Amino acid sequence: MRNVIVLLSLLFLTSCSPKLVYTSDNEKITINYEQDTITTVSINAEYPLGEVKDAEAIRNDYMKVLNDTYGERAVKDVKIIVRDNKIKSVTVLDFRTIKDLSEFGIKSPYPSLNEFEKFLKSSSFRKE
């Protein structure tokens, strides 16, 4: 009986937070959603290292750009790792609070999963 309860709990937890993953050559995008509404998007990307090698300075500059572009409430988290002359960034955005969704191919007044998926596919991302 206990095993059945644990199994049902796991099924419930995983069904409550569905997600989709899209990849390109240097990016991985994980979309969390409820029905057709995107909640958060996590973007993992890797880029060549520029002149600045300090991860905290890169993070602060990147956060400023993201906040100016999407709105301060939209940026949930940014992690920067500098390794092997590359920058790895993990950015989490709350799509429900982004001020201009058209940058992500979304014309609806809400963060539409369907429209964002079309945008990703047209931008050469592949669904995993």
Q: Whereabouts are the PLM-identified features?
A:
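Positively charged n-region of N-terminal signal peptides that target proteins for export
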Residues: 1-4
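Hydrophobic helical h-region of N-terminal Sec-dependent signal peptides
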Residues: 6-10
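C-terminal motif of bacterial Sec signal peptides marking the signal peptidase cleavage site
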Residues: 12-15
